[in-house]
Amino acid sequence: MGSVRSDGCDLYYEEVGEGAPILLIHPSGATASTWGSATEELARIGRVISYDRRGYARSGGEPVRSVSTHTTDAAAILEHLRTPPAVVVGTSAGATMAIDLAVRRPDLVQVVIAHESPWRFTRHLPTVPQVAALAKIGSLALRGRHGDAAEALLRSAYSYRDGGTAWDAFPEEWRRAARRNARAALADFLITIGNYPSSADLATVEVPVVCTHGSRSPNFMFRVTRSLASAIPAARMHRIEGAGHAAPFDATTNFVQLIADTIHLLTP
């Protein structure tokens, strides 16, 4: 573990394993410590680097208002560690940041694995449960109940198409972490559901990108992922069996195997 200075913030990071660098960019309401057993399993195939994004936990700082700031931070970590081009893995908001790293700093990226980025989420017709959840989130946030608002957001985001939500199955410490980092989680949602990176930016991406979606995710998540993949020339789609939005938790083995297979395909 250690820290990297990036634009006034000391970013906390952890690393384990040896081999191909695998940078994990966590989703909203998470930290370097909420990847569960996926970290240990990935360490068998590469050098796993995880970190608390700016605004979260041990990195501290105010909630971030632009994806590009997170992208700059991710680049700073890879540059500090002097890694060769990395396998950059992100889920949800972290997936948007992983893709933006391929846009801004392709020299640092070997391949991106992006699970269910909410890119252009606002352009898709919301479901009735989503409308209700968004109304609740907004009401709670306006009343200053940020922890409750973040819980409502993540409970909805991690819902399964067949009922229930991964949120209820998460370890209690993960849920506490989400509530403690509520303002950062809510900021993540706002900055990643729009049109960033732009379609023009995505069209410039030349490194391979794997856009994944879960077999247990609501149908709209497939449409969001398909829209993103179609905007990136070097992208392909992949369905992770048994997974919802929380793929590293829902289907750890399948999530790790996808990363291992991707690394194998890129190895000369």
What are these regions (language model features)?
Residues 2-61, 77:
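Conserved HGGG/HGGXW glycine-rich cap/lid loop of the alpha/beta-hydrolase fold
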Residues 37-40, 49-89, 93, 254-257:
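Active-site loop/oxyanion-hole signature of alpha/beta-hydrolase fold enzymes
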Residues 52-56, 118, 243:
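Short beta-to-alpha linker loops that shape the active-site pocket of alpha/beta-hydrolase fold enzymes
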Residues 84-125:
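Conserved hydrolase catalytic core segment
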Residues 163, 172-198:
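Hydrophobic, aromatic-rich cap/lid helix
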Residues 205, 211-213:
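Short beta-strand/loop motif that positions the catalytic acidic residue
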Residues 218-224:
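Conserved alpha/beta-hydrolase "acid-adjacent" motif
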Residues 240-256:
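Catalytic histidine-centered segment of alpha/beta-hydrolase-like enzymes
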